[in-house]
């Protein structure tokens, strides 16, 4: 009897599991798609030259790998990226070494991770056809980087793009983990960790979680209910702020890096009307849809087609905003019980990021769109999460598939562009050939030359200070300006820099030799220029 009963049960189990190829089809397709996306984005990132910002991050990671984990002596920008992108740079440099291509590899890894995480957040707990449509819609919207400004804003440097990663991880945690106290603690730790690396987390992570959770909790209290999980999650998010501040102070106390003061402040009222069109263009540029900035028929076509992604995100934002208003309205606890916590946080995060950009920055060009770079992955996740089901029920999947295919083709076309050499690779090679190993330059030439040379040339960043020149407190290892231990006998500049050859002569006297190479002016002295620099300036 045991034989007759075991056979059918074993057969059902085999059928339920399905044949091996079917069970592995989706994981294989997912892996292949992620690899294809990585290499496409890597090629697209390569169309942009590696400049000083990315070079500085690469040099910081290199020092962290080689005995300076706290970046002693470094004066960073207003964003350290210490717990966000710099660990990724370290991992890549362990394999690839110190070279300009590290910046492109990190950009491709970050963007691929963002697409994957946005797809998972969009999918949520849905399975089957709806879960697939949700994920593909989010991933499709993110096939947006266009050549030029969009690629620069999203891929060139760790300029807030990667800050979307911890926020999406947080939303996955909230969506998938049990509603228990330890989930709230884990969320708070994740926010504190990310906040050390980028203060933007305060706007797109801490603030949305606190606002949504505590608003829900207060609404429930009015109906004599206590939402302990929302209270715990909101409090954990709020406590991430003092925790991150304590971590930053601890790093400084241990002799670690110093962060520059954030220059952002409320703009004057007269600036706001000018910010309106630039904010709109910045938003559209993230989706490759900045029609006003497109030049040429091909780029205009690219931008017009990519308007679809921006429109979908705007539609999801309106829908999500309406649901959030209903959740927080006087409709009783039943509405809040059915509300989507993740979608609510996404709505507040997107609105907060755009509002901060509009109110705190004098937006002069679309290049500043990197300040709202997380809006792209967060918006894509929101669109997939809220619109995937309705699109499926409206039988618009064929249209979605066609759009996804077209976006993929256009990404491939954008990735086929000419690969750009590092920004100052030519002059770095020239300096090596002429035996010049330690010098100074304006910011955009200094660390870039150091990276382009693989670290064989040391360059310090200087700026005007009165009638002389001084080291600049911005993405710089200030130890190299110690004239007792280091020397610098040449100066490099290009047309357009504030530090001109005339300024260098006024500061250091007549040079012993002057060279001109491809637009660069290289001035050499037979003395240590560090002794004639003024005190460091911010």
PLM segments and residue spans:
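Hydrophobic/aromatic-rich transmembrane helices and adjacent perimembrane loops
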Residues: 159-166, 203, 301-315, 334-391
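Signature aromatic-anchored transmembrane alpha helix within multi-pass, membrane-resident enzymes
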Residues: 27-33, 235, 239, 331-335, ...
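Membrane-proximal lumenal/periplasmic loop motifs of glycosylation machinery
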Residues: 44-52, 65-90, 101
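Membrane-interface alpha helices of multi-pass inner-membrane proteins
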Residues: 182-210
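Hydrophobic, aromatic-rich transmembrane alpha-helices
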Residues: 213-223, 300-337
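Membrane-interface micro-motifs in multi-pass membrane enzymes
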Residues: 78, 82, 128-175, 197, ...
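Transmembrane-helix motifs of polytopic, lipid-linked glycan transferases
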Residues: 31-35, 105-129, 169
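Short periplasmic/luminal acceptor-recognition loop of GT-C membrane glycosyltransferases, typified by
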Residues: 79, 433-471
């Amino acid at each position: 009897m045991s034989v007759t009963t075991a056979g059918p049960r074993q057969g059902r189990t085999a059928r339920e599991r399905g044949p091996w190829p079917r069970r592995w089809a989706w994981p294989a397709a997912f892996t292949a798609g992620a690899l294809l996306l990585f290499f496409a984005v890597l090629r697209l990132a390569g169309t942009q030259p590696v400049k000083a910002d990315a070079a500085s991050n690469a040099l910081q990671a290199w020092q962290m790998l080689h005995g300076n984990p706290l970046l002693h002596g470094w004066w960073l920008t207003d964003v350290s990226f210490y717990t966000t992108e710099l660990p990724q740079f370290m991992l890549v440099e362990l394999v690839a070494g110190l070279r300009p291509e590290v910046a492109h590899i990190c950009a491709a890894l970050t963007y691929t991770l963002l697409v994957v995480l946005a797809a998972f957040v969009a999918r949520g707990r849905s399975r089957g056809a709806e879960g697939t449509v949700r994920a593909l819609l989010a991933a499709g919207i993110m096939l947006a980087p266009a050549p030029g400004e969009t690629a620069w804003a999203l891929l060139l440097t760790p300029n807030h793009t990667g800050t979307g990663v911890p926020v999406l991880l947080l939303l996955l945690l909230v969506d998938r983990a049990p509603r228990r106290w330890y989930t709230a603690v884990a969320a708070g730790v994740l926010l504190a960790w990310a906040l050390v690396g980028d203060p933007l987390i305060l706007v797109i992570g801490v603030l949305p979680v606190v606002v949504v959770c505590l608003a829900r909790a207060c609404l429930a209290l009015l109906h004599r209910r206590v939402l302990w999980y929302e209270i715990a999650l909101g409090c954990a998010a709020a406590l991430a702020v003092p925790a991150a501040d304590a971590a930053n102070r601890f790093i400084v106390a241990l002799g670690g890096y110093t962060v520059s003061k954030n220059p952002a402040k409320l703009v004057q009222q007269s600036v706001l009307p000018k910010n309106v069109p630039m904010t709109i263009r910045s938003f559209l540029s993230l989706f490759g849809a900045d029609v006003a900035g497109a030049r040429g028929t091909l780029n205009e076509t690219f931008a017009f087609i990519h308007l679809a992604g921006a429109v979908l995100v705007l539609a999801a934002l309106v829908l999500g905003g309406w649901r959030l208003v209903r959740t927080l309205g006087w409709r009783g606890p039943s509405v809040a019980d059915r509300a989507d916590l993740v979608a609510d946080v996404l709505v507040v995060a997107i609105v907060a990021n755009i509002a901060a950009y509009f109110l705190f920055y004098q937006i002069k060009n679309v290049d500043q769109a990197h300040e709202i770079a997380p809006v792209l992955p967060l918006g894509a996740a929101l669109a997939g999460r809220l619109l995937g089901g309705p699109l499926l029920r409206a039988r618009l999947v064929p249209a979605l598939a066609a759009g996804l295919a077209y976006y993929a083709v256009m990404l491939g076309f954008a990735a086929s562009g000419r690969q750009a050499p590092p920004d100052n690779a030519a002059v770095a090679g020239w300096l090596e050939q002429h035996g010049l190993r330690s010098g100074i330059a304006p910011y955009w030439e200094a660390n870039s030359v150091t990276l382009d040379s693989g670290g064989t040339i040391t360059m310090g960043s200087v700026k005007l200070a009165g009638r002389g020149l001084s080291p600049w407190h911005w993405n710089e290892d200030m130890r190299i300006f110690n004239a007792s231990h280091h020397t610098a006998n040449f100066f490099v500049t290009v047309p357009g820099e504030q530090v001109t050859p005339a300024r260098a002569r006024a500061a250091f006297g007549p040079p012993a030799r002057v060279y001109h190479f491809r637009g660069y002016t290289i001035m050499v002295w037979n003395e240590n220029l560090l002794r004639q620099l003024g005190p460091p300036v911010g």
